């Protein structure tokens, strides 16, 4: 069992010159969600003999920009925006400000180890994601996705040795 809680205040990882923010190739290097969020992760793993199961659950909230003509403020979630421009306020800044969005991700996987030498596994997987903002806009809207997958995987060249 593992549990992890992360909280990042608005405007963290951003800069007044967006080219000097804490990002690379349009990705945040500090955290995949950028700034202005809080999340709780829980991971459980089980194996008995050659059977195994993994469960990963993520629950969080993130404050996004509205990006509308009536409200084009920078609420601190996008690290590629200048944190000095279009701030709605300088004091009373809270995590989740802006278009507060609830996020839920569940990833469940189970399988059977066919060959331990090559780590060949037969597996099945279920992934569910729910993205639920307080207000739907053209760029941010309520969406749920579900994936089922199954297959065979292997580490053909498993050259990790402990001496």
Enumerate the predicted regions with their spans.
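Exposed, low-structure sequence patches enriched in small/polar residues
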Residues: 1-163
């Amino acid at each position: 069992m593992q549990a992890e809680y992360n909280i990042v205040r608005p405007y963290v990882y951003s800069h007044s010159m967006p080219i000097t923010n804490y990002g690379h190739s349009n990705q945040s290097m500090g955290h995949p969600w950028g700034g202005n969020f809080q999340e709780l992760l829980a991971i459980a793993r089980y194996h008995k003999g050659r059977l195994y199961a993994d469960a990963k659950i993520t629950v969080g909230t993130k404050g996004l920009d509205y990006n509308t003509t009536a409200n084009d403020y920078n609420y601190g979630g996008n690290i590629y925006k200048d944190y000095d421009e279009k701030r709605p306020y300088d004091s009373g800044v809270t995590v989740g400000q802006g278009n507060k969005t609830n996020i839920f991700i569940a990833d469940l996987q189970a399988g059977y180890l066919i060959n331990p030498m090559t780590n060949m596994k037969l597996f099945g997987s279920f992934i569910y994601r729910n993205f639920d903002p307080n207000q739907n806009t053209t760029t941010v809207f309520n969406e749920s996705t579900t994936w089922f997958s199954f297959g065979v995987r292997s580490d053909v060249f498993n050259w990790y040795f402990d001496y």
